[in-house]
């Protein structure tokens, strides 16, 4: 059966990959004051961070059910008989719910929706591997969901944020945490656990935090790393610590998407790791 794949824009699948495989991206939306943009479509990450640094206030929304339904209908019209869709964690976004609602409004095509319970480019890596393995005949359709969750258990991301204003505004920090962080320059190590944000540690200063992140990751014996960043200076700091800790390890770099940047703000950097070969 002819099979297509769909995912939302926060998973940051490589654009070139989409040109070579039947994968459609549904963009989430970012609002800056009164202007609405499509994530990585009508606004780039660089433009987004420039705007919020100028004082514009960001907010996000999941794609509309109608927009997702249109993607499904277009794939059906192209002759696809099955769709496998991957979404950002349902515990931090309503995207999974929107994908599910849209699937209930179309007939004549089988749709499987997978809640990845993770975020950002590390999920995109798992999605790319699954699609490649399926397309090459190395992964059966009925095993896709199990394989996805297997891969997702072998990866994660650890992020730190210098400016807590956005996390606090989004209700993800208490007032006490917010005040202490700003006063003492205590930065959190934030990761994803069971689909939600989890603080695995707190340290004073960016260099100390990045060192601790790399030490945690080194225990996982990763095959490759992904540095996610918002500014070039934070990227450089992360690269220096990675080189010192890991030496010559395959490392991808990618700027954090506008939707995720809405919550993390303009001063964030993270390191993701994969325990499997891409």
Enumerate the predicted regions with their spans.
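Mixed-charge interfacial surface used for oligomerization/domain docking
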Residues: 3-4, 10-24, 29-31, 35, ...
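Class I S-adenosyl-L-methionine
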Residues: 36-85, 90-98, 104-105
């Amino acid at each position: 059966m002819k099979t297509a794949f769909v995912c939302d824009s926060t998973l940051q699948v490589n654009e070139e990959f989409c040109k070579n495989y039947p994968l459609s991206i549904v963009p989430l939306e970012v609002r800056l004051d009164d202007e609405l943009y499509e994530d990585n479509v009508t606004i780039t990450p660089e433009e987004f961070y420039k705007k919020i640094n100028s004082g514009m206030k960001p907010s996000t929304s999941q794609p509309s059910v109608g927009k997702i339904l249109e993607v499904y209908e277009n794939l059906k019209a192209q002759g696809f008989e099955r769709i496998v869709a991957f979404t950002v964690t349902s515990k931090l976004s309503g995207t999974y719910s929107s994908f599910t609602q849209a699937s209930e409004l179309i007939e004549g095509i089988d749709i499987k929706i997978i809640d990845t319970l993770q975020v950002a480019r590390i999920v995109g890596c798992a999605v790319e591997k699954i699609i490649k393995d399926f397309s090459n005949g190395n992964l059966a359709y009925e095993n896709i969901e199990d394989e996805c969750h297997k891969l997702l258990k072998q990866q994660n991301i650890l992020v730190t944020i210098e400016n807590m204003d956005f996390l606090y505004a989004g209700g993800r920090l208490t007032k006490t945490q917010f005040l202490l962080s700003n006063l003492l320059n205590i930065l959190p190590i934030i990761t994803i656990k069971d689909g939600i944000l989890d603080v695995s540690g707190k340290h004073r200063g960016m260099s100390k935090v990045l060192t601790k992140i790399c030490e945690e990751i080194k225990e996982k014996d990763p095959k490759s790393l992904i540095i996610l960043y918002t500014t070039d200076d934070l990227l450089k700091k992360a690269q220096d610590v990675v080189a010192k800790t890991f030496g010559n390890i395959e490392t991808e770099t990618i700027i954090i998407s506008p939707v995720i940047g809405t919550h993390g703000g303009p001063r964030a950097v993270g390191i993701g790791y994969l325990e499997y070969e891409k």
